[in-house]
Amino acid sequence: MWQTNEVAGKLIDEGTEVEIIGVKSTGDLSLGGNLSADVGQFVKSVDEKLLSGEVDIAIHSSKDVPVDYDNRISILGYLERGPTSDIILFSYKAEGSKKLNEVINSSVSHDLETILDTFPKGGRIGTSSVRRQSFFLSKRDDVVPLAIRGRVETRIERLLQGRVEGIILAEAGLHRLSLLDALPKGSSEINAMRISSEDWPTAPGQGAIVVHCLKDRLGELSWVNKRLNDYSTEVSVGEERRILQSLGGGCKTPVGVECVNGESRGYMAPENWREEYVSGNSFQLLPIDKYGITPQPENQAVPDDRGNPGHSSKLVSTLNSERMGNKLRNMGIEVLNTPVIELSEIKNNWPEFHLDVTIPRNEWPILILTSPFASRCASMMVEEIPDLGKIQWLAIGSGTARSCFRHGNPASICANASNSKELENYIKENIPSNVNLLIPRSSVGNNNMANNLKTAGFTVNSWVGYENSRKNVEFDEMNAQDVLLISSPSSAKSWDSNQLPVPDTVLCMGLTTKTEIQNIERFNNTEVIVLDGPVTESISQWWSENRK
C-alpha cells in the first residue's frame, strides 16, 4: 500500500482528485513455499480491476510484473527508482556486520564471499525468491533454504523468532519502513550486511514502482506519465526486462541483472540448479550481458555410483539418499545404496482440506512432515488438494526440508530435530497451540506424537498418508570391515527378514532404530552406533576417526 500512497501523493500534489481502492492479491493469500507456481500472482488480481473498469491506474513493484504479460495492459510510467541492493539480516552477530539501521543509512557493501564466511555451516536461509535461493546455494550447498513469505515485517519477525539464521530482503522495502519508523520491535538489535551488486545483481526492476493502465487509454492518461515518469528509471528497468525476456525469464527464472549508465551485467542460474543442489552436486552461475548471452555450463563431474573402491571398507546404506551418497563419495567413501523398504502414497487416505483465508494468517494450519517421503507425498497431493500448498510446511530436519525443496514446495520451518520426540518438543516450544496441525504418517508409524500434542492443547489431524512395506532384496557384497547404515526400525526388520549379511559395525539413525536393532538376533555380535547430528556430516566424522 506504501507504493500506492506514494503515487497518490504525487498526483494529489499536482491537484488531482484520487480514490485508493485496495486489492488483495493471490500472492497475499498464501504462506506456502511455491512462490513461483503462478508467475505474476502479485499483479494479476490488481490488474483485473483495470480490465473491469473499476480503477483507472494500477500500482505495482516492477520486479513482480512478468515480462510476457496481458497485451491489453500497458506501462504508463515509473517513479524514480529507489535502492536496488539486497540486504542480509542475521539472527546472530555476524563478523563485520552492523546494526540494521546503520546499514540502511550507509552505502557500505560487502562482497559475497565475506558474507558467506560468516554464515554457519548447515544454517537456514529464509527467502522465497529463486534468484536469491540459487545465488546463495551456488556458493554454499550446505545451507538449507526455507520459504519465508508475507510482508517485510512478518519476515523480520520470523528471523527474530529464530526460525532461520538469515533472511535476504530488498533494501528498498527496508528503507521505506525505516523512513516510516515501521520496522518491527526488536529490529534495532538485528545485525545486517548489504550484499555487493558486483556479486549479487538485482532482480530486474527491483526498487522501482510502475504504473499500469489499459492500453487503449494510454493517450487519454498521458498526463499521468508526464507528472510521474522518471526517464532514467524507465530506461534502466526497460533494459533489464528486455534482457530477462530474451532469457525466457519470469518469477521462475533465477536471473539477476542490473543496468547502470547503459551498461548491463548479471548472472543466471543453470536450468538444473535445483536438481544439482538437492543431489549434492555443485553448480555455477552463468554470466550474462546486454545481449543476454549465457554460456553453457561445463559438464559437471558425476560421482561414480560406487564411489572410490580403493578403500578397504565401504558404507552400505538403507537410506536411499542421492545427496548423501554423492557427498560421501566426493569425500572418498565408497557408498552402496541398498534400500530395503518400499514406500508408496495412499492418496485416498488424505483428508479434504479447505483453507479458511478469512482467519488471521498466524492461525492458519501447519503441515508437519516427519520424513523426506512424507514431503514427496505432500508435494504430489498439492495437485489434488491445492490449499495444502498455501499453508506453511514444517520439516523435521534438513533432509526433509531439502526434499520439500526438490519437489518445488520449500518448507517454511525446519525443526532440526533428530527424532519425533525432539520434533514434538520443538512444536510445543515454537508453535502456538491455537494453530491446527496436519500430520501424515507412515503405515508403520505410531500416533504417539500426535496424541502428546493433543494433550498439550493442540488440535491435530493425523492420518496414514503412505504405505511402508518390506522390499525383497538380494545382497551379498558385505565384508566384515564394511559399515551398514540403517535408517529406521522398519529397515532393520526388513534387513533381517531378507536374511542379509551383517558387518561388525552398524550406524543407525535414532535411538528407536538402535533399540529395534538390538532386539534382532542377527545383530547380536554387532557394534551399534547412533549417529548424532546431520547424517552426512556425522558419517563423515565417524569415518575419518575410525576408517582412515
What do these predicted ranges mean?
Residues S52-V55, V164, K252, W364, ...:
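Short, high-confidence coil segments that cap the C-terminus of an alpha-helix
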Residues L50, L159-L160, L453:
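Hydrophobic residues within well-ordered alpha-helices
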Residues K63, N71-D142, N419-E422, I427-I431:
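A conserved helix-loop-strand patch within extracytoplasmic ligand-binding domains
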Residues G32-H60, H354-A374:
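Short, structured active-site "lid" loops
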Residues M1-A37, V43, S62, D68, ...:
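Small-molecule-sensing regulatory modules
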Residues G292-K548:
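Signature of uroporphyrinogen-III synthase
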Residues V46-D47, R155-I156, L423:
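Short, hydrophobic alpha-helical packing/hinge segments within bilobed ligand-binding/sensory domains
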Residues V7, L11-G15, S129, F136, ...:
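Hydrophobic alpha-helical packing residues
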